């Protein structure tokens, strides 16, 4: 490590100031998370049943302060809402922050969490950084610049699905798993690491063939979506509609998405569509 940034990541410099800042902020947040990890305390439960720690609040507040100093006209949308967020997402540039994606792991002193920073322009991801401080894995991407892990270029291989394929699925499902998910469990191998952003980054690496989440938030995916897209992968709503550009009036709504390498994504979409046709 040098100045808190993995040495290999210094081999590739993002081409614009917002992308560089996204990387800086993800690493800054990750350093705070790592310092607080062993003594994580102050756990509370939010009304939606998710965990919140003091580290979530501390990291988000710090990142928002840095953004306000560097880009005062930009909008910030953070999971915990610690800053003076605008009620409407006006403006071209949005900073979408998940201070700790995987808080349920972090708060239990388990690995499987990260800091995610995404930059959207007119509703489309243009830069992102996802940092896992325990593994020291830093995923970065910016529009037209490719996807990177600690300075090495990554690509999502266009591999078809097979019995050896791994996929990630959100839980819980209060109304029970839908038929297409039962089919996936019968044919492929489930992995769940507890962080949507890391799931998407693992798909960009080719480790996961596809990822499905029926109730994600924009901050869960904003930083990692461009990593997957720049790696050659795909992400859409679960019904196949384009996810981006995302409109301001729906940016805070739950998102059901499907993502993965371009081949697996298409095949998984076919499964979802077929199940819906049967239901009709």
Name each model-derived stretch.
Residues 1-100, 278-280:
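N-terminal subdomain of lithium-sensitive/metallo-dependent phosphomonoesterases centered on the IMPase/IPPase/PAP
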Residues 2-24, 201-280:
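Oxyanion/phosphate-interacting regions
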Residues 10, 117-201, 243, 247-280:
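Acidic beta-strand-loop-alpha-helix segment within the catalytic core
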Residues 69, 77, 85-152, 226-229:
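Active-site-adjacent structural elements in enzyme catalytic cores
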Residues 73-75, 189, 209, 234:
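Residue-level detector of anion-binding/catalytic polar loops
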